[in-house]
Amino acid sequence: MPRKGPAPKRPLVNDPVYGSQLVTQLVNKVLLDGKKSLAERIVYGALEQAREKTGTDPVVTLKRAMDNVKPSLEVRSRRVGGATYQVPVEVRPDRSVTLALRWLVSFSKARREKTMIERLANEILDASNGLGAAVKRREDTHKMAEANRAFAHYRW
């Protein structure tokens, strides 16, 4: 355990194309092996494809997708006596954004389209329409929390 307390949050810069912190976070989630320019090419390509398919601002589409994917509840393991309970807890806003981006990117990688640009674009479009694997993951997370509601009094 560190004695100095939690590390300070580093400020995120807005991305140069759309001026959005959310796009910057998405680029950082797509990033592999430090290849930032490749990650930017993938994200900007996906957002451009989303613009072509919907005819609307891609950042608005991304925000709508994020609203459909962000979880409000999750379960955490809590050991009480000899048993481990799945205790439902509310998700902090910054964590919900992080989880939503993580799910969008991971389920994009699992899709069957040819390029990562197409996969990410289609996952974002599906999520903005309330479809797709990332939205299903959120629903499953909420179902788990609802099923374990009886253990909510073990919150810490």
Swiss-Prot record:
Keywords: Ribonucleoprotein, Ribosomal protein, RNA-binding, rRNA-binding, tRNA-binding. InterPro entries: Ribosomal_uS7 (IPR000235), Ribosomal_uS7_bac/org-type (IPR005717), Ribosomal_uS7_CS (IPR020606), Ribosomal_uS7_dom (IPR023798), Ribosomal_uS7_dom_sf (IPR036823). Gene3D superfamilies: Ribosomal protein S7 domain. GO terms for biological process: translation. GO terms for cellular component: small ribosomal subunit. CDD domains: uS7_Bacteria. GO terms for molecular function: rRNA binding; structural constituent of ribosome; tRNA binding. PROSITE patterns: RIBOSOMAL_S7. One of the primary rRNA binding proteins, it binds directly to 16S rRNA where it nucleates assembly of the head domain of the 30S subunit. Is located at the subunit interface close to the decoding center, probably blocks exit of the E-site tRNA. Part of the 30S ribosomal subunit. Contacts proteins S9 and S11. Belongs to the universal ribosomal protein uS7 family. This is Small ribosomal subunit protein uS7. The gene is rpsG.
